[in-house]
């Protein structure tokens, strides 16, 4: 099938219909949800750290604790605003630190725990008990535990959230088919952190975040806004830099772009990952105009603002919308796609066109209807030879 035959089903009609709605939907987050403030951020970071130092840790609650940590960085007021703006009716539980007494092998011990409705004091106590066992083992092996190996090192919470940044890009698939890719990527980018923490098990932590995002969809909205806020904040630790790279690679540099779901103005529907290729697409000129209408998040924002990160995919696949450009590996042209494309016509046409480009060695930029500035950016970045490019 020719690429010219691949069309998006009545995109603009959908947009018009949704834009004229006079009503909004209110959702409930449940009876009570925990919304911690800045003052308990250090304690939540330590909880993440306890899980990270625990050898063979049980990560059942790691996703939840990671999200609580993210909210503590945003602060209670901003988290509430995010949820309310997303249409959620919120009954928020304040979170404080209290002393909890718990029996451990017949002996009463005291633990500092948080007043959470989502995580009992006993569970928090058990996390600390298990972490102490691993810490004692570390003391025997090392003699002295360096700060970056401890459970209270400042980047523990962000290490956990790096895994969440990888998971969030795969949610639109509707299942956990992206888990293997998440694990592979985490093993690569967090390899130094995995040397520090034996409890950093990407598969288990990723599954925990999948569970949280599936069970509590309001956390998706919170995490996306947290990711934007975190990535836009200057400075920070090395792990904060890793997080920003992971999140913005998904959100702002190509993979998380245009899909019909973006019309619903839903943050969840913007998070695409491999599912982007399964969505219905228009051809690039129409998509480009539509993306301009919707604003930077929807389309070719990254061409104008981050050409270095995106022009390679633009070079390889110029006749597709930005979401396909940014997710070329998922499309299968690079031989990475292992799923069944829902839009087989698009997949076949894209593959055929890419193979044609490869055989001819000529890239036709004219189909993109690019501005002079964009063409100049491409030339400056790629330094193409005149006989390699049709302008």
Swiss-Prot record:
GO cellular component, one term: helical viral capsid
Region (Involved in RNA synthesis and encapsidation): 1-364
GO BP annotations, alphabetical order: symbiont-mediated suppression of host cytoplasmic pattern recognition receptor signaling pathway via inhibition of MAVS activity; symbiont-mediated suppression of host cytoplasmic pattern recognition receptor signaling pathway via inhibition of MDA-5 activity; symbiont-mediated suppression of host NF-kappaB cascade; symbiont-mediated suppression of host PKR/eIFalpha signaling; symbiont-mediated suppression of host type I interferon-mediated signaling pathway
Gene Ontology molecular-function annotations: protein serine/threonine kinase inhibitor activity; RNA binding
Modified residues (Phosphotyrosine): 38
Region Interaction with the phosphoprotein, annotated ranges: 244-290, 338-364
Predominant location category: virion
Compartmental location: Virion; Host cytoplasm
Keywords: Capsid protein, Helical capsid protein, Host cytoplasm, Host-virus interaction, Inhibition of host innate immune response by virus, Inhibition of host interferon signaling pathway by virus, Inhibition of host MAVS by virus, Inhibition of host MDA5 by virus, Inhibition of host NF-kappa-B by virus, Inhibition of host PKR by virus, Inhibition of host RLR pathway by virus, Interferon antiviral system evasion, Phosphoprotein, Ribonucleoprotein, RNA-binding, Viral immunoevasion, Viral nucleoprotein, Virion
Keyword S-adenosyl-L-methionine appears in the UniProt entry: no
Post-translational modification: Tyrosine phosphorylation modulates viral transcription and replication.
The keyword Lyase is annotated on this UniProt entry: no
Function: Encapsidates the viral RNA genome by forming a left-handed helical nucleocapsid that protects the RNA from nucleases. RNA replication depends on the availability of soluble nucleoprotein. The encapsidated genomic RNA is termed the NC and serves as template for transcription and replication. Together with the phosphoprotein, sequesters host NF-kappa-B in inclusion bodies (IBs) thereby inhibiting this host defense pathway. May also act as a modulator of the innate immune response by sequestration of host IFIH1/MDA5 and MAVS into IBs.
Assembly, per entry: Homomultimerizes to form the nucleocapsid. Binds to viral genomic RNA. Interacts with the phosphoprotein P. When in a monomeric RNA-free form, interacts with the phosphoprotein (via N-terminus). Interacts with protein M2-1; this interaction allows the association of nucleocapsid with the matrix protein. Interacts with host EIF2AK2/PKR; this interaction inhibits EIF2AK2 phosphorylation of EIF2S1 and blocks EIF2AK2-mediated translation shutoff.
Similarity remark: Belongs to the paramyxoviruses nucleocapsid family.
Descriptive protein name: Nucleoprotein
The species this protein was found in: Bovine respiratory syncytial virus (strain 391-2)
Gene name per UniProt: N
């Amino acid at each position: 099938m020719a690429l010219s035959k691949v069309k998006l089903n009545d995109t603009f009609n959908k947009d018009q219909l949704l834009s004229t709605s006079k009503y909004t939907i209110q959702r409930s987050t449940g009876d009570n949800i925990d919304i911690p403030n800045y003052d308990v951020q250090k304690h939540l970071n330590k909880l993440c750290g306890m899980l990270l130092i625990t050898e063979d840790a049980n990560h059942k609650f790691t996703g939840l604790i990671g999200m609580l940590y993210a909210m503590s960085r945003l602060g209670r007021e901003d988290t509430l605003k995010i949820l309310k703006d997303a249409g959620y009716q919120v009954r928020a539980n304040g979170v404080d630190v209290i002393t909890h007494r718990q029996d451990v092998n017949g002996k009463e011990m005291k633990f500092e725990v948080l007043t959470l409705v989502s995580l009992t004091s006993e569970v928090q106590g058990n996390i600390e008990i298990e972490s102490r066992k691993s810490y004692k083992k570390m003391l025997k092996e090392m003699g002295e535990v360096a700060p970056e190996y401890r459970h209270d090192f400042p980047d523990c919470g962000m290490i956990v959230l790096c895994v969440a940044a990888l998971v969030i890009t795969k949610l639109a698939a509707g299942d956990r088919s992206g888990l293997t890719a998440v694990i592979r990527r985490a093993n690569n980018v967090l390899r130094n952190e995995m040397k520090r923490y034996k409890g950093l098990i990407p598969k288990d932590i990723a599954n925990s975040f999948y569970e949280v995002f599936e069970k509590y969809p309001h956390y998706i909205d919170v995490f996306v806004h947290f990711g934007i806020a975190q990535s836009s904040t200057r400075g920070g630790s090395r792990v904060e830099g890793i997080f920003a790279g992971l999140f913005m690679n998904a959100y702002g540099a190509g993979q998380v772009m245009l899909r019909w779901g973006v019309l619903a103005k839903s943050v969840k529907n913007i998070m695409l990952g491999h599912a982007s290729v399964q969505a219905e697409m228009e051809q690039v000129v129409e998509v480009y105009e539509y993306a301009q209408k919707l604003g930077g998040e929807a389309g070719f924002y990254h061409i104008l603002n981050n050409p270095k990160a995106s022009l390679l995919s633009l070079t390889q696949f110029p006749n597709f919308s930005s979401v396909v450009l940014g997710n070329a590996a998922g499309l299968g042209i690079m031989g990475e796609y292992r799923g069944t494309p829902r839009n087989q016509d698009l997949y076949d046409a894209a593959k055929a066109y890419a193979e044609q480009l490869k055989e001819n060695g000529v890239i036709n930029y004219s189909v993109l209807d690019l501005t002079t500035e964009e063409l100049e950016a491409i030339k400056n970045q790629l330094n193409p030879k005149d006989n390699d490019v049709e302008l």
